[in-house]
Amino acid sequence: MITSAHIDDIRTQVRAWHAKGETVAFVPTMGNLHQGHITLVKEAAKKCDHVVVSIFVNPMQFGQNEDLDAYPRTLEADSQALTAAGAELLFTPTPTVIYPKGLAQQTYVEVPGISDVLCGASRPGHFRGVATVVCKLFNIVQPDVAFFGNKDYQQLLVIRTMVEDLSLPIEIIGVDTIREASGLAMSSRNGYLTAEEKAAAPALKKAIDAMAQGIKQGVSIEQVTAEAKASLIAAGFTPDYLEVCHATTLANAETTDQALVILAAAYLGKARLIDNLRFDR
């Protein structure tokens, strides 16, 4: 696997592949990789001739008092895992490479509406940071296809909308959430959990599953939400949000909506965990 922190190196290699008529998949990450990331790379390798991965802890998507400095950097282990999974090109830029003028002078990409609710309301500016860096990485790598995890459901919708609105010639593929045996969605932030907290963490998925089951049985959204919040609090969580939304617009679910998604974020100790469930009523 070739590794470079330089934009020109990445572009030169991808152009060479495209010149031969070969397809290129891209998996953007922030590193500290787990099996969920590796699954994205393996799926990308099935779809395309070559796989490019980026590791960049993006300062623009972290708010004040968030975990930018504490976010784990594990480049050596990540590189070994990516090589084994089939990645051929790894882009590891510094913030200066991505934002040479600094954040204050950077052009931004902002996706209105869906960026402002749920995680966007809890973390102002977060999705502007995500959209900007992903758009920039797309322009650097010029992939044919890009892969993202469905665990970050709102992020995936933001990126799909950005690609559509800006007419970017990239296919976006979402990959099912990879879970631990307990049902806990794999996340780099699971490393913040103590052993006791990790034992309690599967309650988040259980609460979401119970909500979906209740809604399918005709129980009101208000009732299933109240019961789920109570169960999370009893398990030691501090809920951030727990919402039932239209699956594609993220508007609050109406009684006539069939395609729904439950989106949840909750704090457990130092970790902010998110999860979701897409289902039909």
UniProtKB/Swiss-Prot annotation:
Active site residues according to the UniProt entry: 37
Disulfide feature: none
BP GO annotations: pantothenate biosynthetic process
Binding site for ATP: 30-37, 149-152, 178, 186-189
EC number, UniProt record: 6.3.2.1
Keyword annotations of the record: ATP-binding, Cytoplasm, Ligase, Nucleotide-binding, Pantothenate biosynthesis
Pathway: Cofactor biosynthesis; (R)-pantothenate biosynthesis; (R)-pantothenate from (R)-pantoate and beta-alanine: step 1/1
Subcellular location(s) per record: Cytoplasm
Binding, (R)-pantoate: 61, 155
Residues where beta-alanine binds: 61
Main location: cytoplasm
GO terms, molecular function: ATP binding; pantoate-beta-alanine ligase activity
Reaction equation(s) it catalyzes: (R)-pantoate + beta-alanine + ATP = (R)-pantothenate + AMP + diphosphate + H(+)
A Pfam entry, by short name: Pantoate_ligase
Any one annotated GO CC term: cytosol
Signal sequence coordinates: none
Family: Belongs to the pantothenate synthetase family.
Additional comment: The reaction proceeds by a bi uni uni bi ping pong mechanism.
PANTHER family: CYTIDYLATE KINASE/PANTOATE-BETA-ALANINE LIGASE, PANTOATE--BETA-ALANINE LIGASE
Function as written in the Swiss-Prot or TrEMBL entry: Catalyzes the condensation of pantoate with beta-alanine in an ATP-dependent reaction via a pantoyl-adenylate intermediate.
Subunit details: Homodimer.
HAMAP family: PanC
Protein name, UniProt field: Pantothenate synthetase
Organism, as annotated: Shewanella sp. (strain ANA-3)
